[in-house]
Amino acid sequence: MLESHIELEVPSIIMFDPENPGEELTDVSHNDIASVQLNFHGPFSGSAVLVFPSESVEKLVTALTGEKPDSEGFAKATSETLCEVGNILINAVMGSIANLLATQIDFSTPNYKEGKFTDLIKSKGSKKAMTFLLIRTNFKVQDPQISGNVFLIFELGSIGDLLTAIDKL
């Protein structure tokens, strides 16, 4: 899509409390972000959220659509583009997990949101008891420089099911 080298790496996996994200998340916790969320169901349930800092959003949308940030159609292009990119990346991450665990995971349609990261995770955590697992998947594009993160948010109990499945490997 971008005709540029794309790098996905997983430098860390962190569990955290949505009320107190901790030092590991200072680079995203108080900044404006754009996110795409897909809920998933299977042997474990929750949400996968792809988070981009606002400066990466502008670069990504411009690179993929040609729309400029000050153009009339940029907001619509942003929502549509990030939903598509989020769908692809999240399905790749979750598909790899499902393949590794020899199971099937079903997804909802992508949902696009903008705002502060702390507001996003607090609103997500307030609906049900949740365990937040950050599989910090760095999404990097060399030219233009774009980065993002994938967060996995599990319903209470589902994280135990995931860990049990991993232990069986």
Segments (PLM) and residue ranges:
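Composition-driven recognition of glycine/serine/threonine/acidic- and proline-rich low-complexity segments
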Residues: 1-169
